[in-house]
């Protein structure tokens, strides 16, 4: 099988010739640039500056030589711009605090404050506001909360203005975007045999990475995360109006995207909203069913009616109690499958595969990234990876990836042990 054939078999719940692997096809299956740099060195690959494909999380580009070294089966059709609001071109050097040499898009503008924190300007515009901060010694960015005071929750809901507050956050794609997607999708589809993940984005309803308005130069309304979650109970019509607007824009963008890429992609990235904590849900099931599920169903239904793509849905945490609702809303591929949160509440890999293996393609869950991968021994990594692959890869419906992105400071030996266990062969 080619990589593309292998992934197509897996996402259609057919047994592939061996377990498919994803390293870096999107912003939830990647690797911090510092770790990419060290892994390349450990594998004897060229040492060079790495482009940051996703600068918010500081994810390093997974180039062809590394894709081949670990036998990864997917590549991402990324957007021309990034979630920091500037284009992925005009690359300029940017060294991480640990010395890792990277390139970042030319629109990146930042200052260093008195504490040594890197303060990033919104959309590269020094006349606007700081939107992101990387603490001194850090390896990724955090959003900046621009509202010092809690939102006044004593207001009448009819006095709120959700459409005005959020009009700058959701934008219909441009003709230039469409031309880029068409050209890049043709290059990836015709020039490689990798499966292709369309990293469109835009349907992360209530995603904590976007609620503060990092790409809005003058964010308004309910933006502090604690206020936003409280508003689900106090102002549900406000939340629903925001989601209605976001969904309407997403459906327009999906139409543009389909015209641009056709059937050259196999999976489309839909949402990265986290609904789970380490111990349970952020909200009740009824709240999810009322405010979120109808919108996700509308988006997933459009994809299934109009394309042959599978939909990719990311949610960290213990989401055991949402699995049935996610299935009913049309989710195909579930990521990152955080067993470190799900298993203590009764959802083991075996039970998940038995009860939901015919419904979802599980995309991740290959090794615990909170404890085993960063702090375990290579033998402990091998043991857990072997068990997860044995259970989850039965009958297809599985793409190997750790639980979420691999962060900085993970030992290279553990990463090599991880990939060698999946492949059943040495990679160096």
PLM feature segments, named:
Residues 36, 40-85, 92:
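Segments that shape or occlude catalytic/ligand-binding pockets
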Residues 89-143, 162, 168-169:
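Non-catalytic, alpha-helical, charged scaffold/linker segments
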Residues 65-69, 101-102, 111, 187-191:
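Short, charge-rich binding segments
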Residues 1-41, 45-53, 62, 138-428:
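Active-site loop segments of alpha/beta catalytic cores
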Residues 21-27, 41, 57, 73, ...:
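Generic detector of intrinsically disordered, low-complexity, polar/charged segments
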Residues 28-31, 85-86, 126-132, 205-206:
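Short, surface-exposed beta-strand/loop "edge" segments at domain boundaries and coil↔beta transitions
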